[in-house]
Amino acid sequence: MPVFMIERQFAEELEAVDAAGLKEINDEESVQWLYSFLSKDKRKTYCLYEAESADAIRAAAERAGIPADVIVEVTQTIQPDGSFSSLP
């Protein structure tokens, strides 16, 4: 399944999320949240997801009432030695 990086900008500091509610929406949209990075000011996240398409991620975000400012499909990682690795 394709992997996407999502950048989310929040107007206020991010607080605890309703993980069960998000999982239910994501399951219905065939989206799997892998993990996220949270900025120091807690107003921006960079999230890694598996989904069939960017549209599925956008639909899940709209239903959950959270932003999905930038959605980019990613296919490889770059290692510290400069080599590229395909995502599993």
Describe each region flagged by the PLM.
Residues L34-L38:
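Short, flexible, solvent-exposed loop/turn segments with mixed acidic/basic and small polar residues
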